[in-house]
Design a protein with these regions (language model features):
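Active-site acidic catalytic loop and adjacent metal/ATP-binding pocket
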Residues: 70-121
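ATP-dependent phospho-/nucleotidyl transfer catalytic cores
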Residues: 10-90
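Helix N-cap / loop-to-helix initiation motif
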Residues: 155-159
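Internal "kinase-insert"/substrate-recognition segments embedded within catalytic cores
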Residues: 1-10
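Gram-positive cell-envelope targeting signals
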Residues: 1, 45-46, 61, 107-109, ...
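Active-site activation/catalytic loop segments of kinase-like enzymes and analogous catalytic loops
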Residues: 121-154, 167-179
């Protein structure tokens, strides 16, 4: 990420066309989808095991999701995003272990099909979420990942705040409900 901005040849129209989805809009849409699914499932006469569990835990998950949406609106995210677009910060879009090749002490990132110009913390968030899901949300590992990342590219307070809000959002619950 340190070197992934101000790509030569990018013009303003390119940045606008390649801009990622505004996280405020994304969380609002996800929350709307969660409510829509809840309404649909609640109206069903016969619920399967997943649907019954969804209804049972929806209230607490909804509170968590709405809190993340509210916090994002109250932070400096808008300025963070504006800066990312002005600087032409490149996000991979799918920065997960499947797209990282390590050989001979060097790492190569592949598959940039979903790249965008956006807040680079989105990539770190996705990577951390995927790794931490597989490691039972080990907080020590999360701190170590942040420390290691910060040694290469120091994180500003507003970036850490944004990352924390993204990690707060019940993304896995939303994904399960939608698929």
């Amino acid at each position: 990420h340190r070197d992934m901005k101000q790509v030569p040849g990018f013009e303003r129209k390119d940045v606008e066309r390649l801009a990622g989805i505004d996280a405020r809009e994304e969380l609002a849409r996800h929350n709307q989808e969660l409510r829509k699914i809840y309404t649909f499932v609640r109206r069903k006469n016969r619920k399967n095991e997943f649907e019954a569990a969804y209804i049972q835990c929806f209230s607490s998950i909804r509170e968590e999701a709405e809190r993340a949406e509210r916090l994002l609106k109250e932070t400096s995210y808008e300025a963070l995003r504006r800066q990312a677009l002005e600087e032409g910060q490149i996000c991979h879009g799918e920065y997960i272990h499947h797209n990282l090749l390590v050989a001979g002490g060097h790492m190569t990132v592949i598959n940039f099909e979903k790249f965008s110009v956006d807040v680079q913390m989105n990539d770190l968030y996705l990577f951390m979420r995927k790794v931490l899901e597989k490691q039972n949300y080990d907080a020590r590992l999360g701190r170590k990942m942040l420390k290691t990342y910060s040694e290469v590219r120091p994180l500003r307070d507003e970036e850490l705040e944004y990352l924390g809000i993204r990690l707060l959002y019940p993304e896995k619950f939303w994904k399960l409900a939608n698929y």
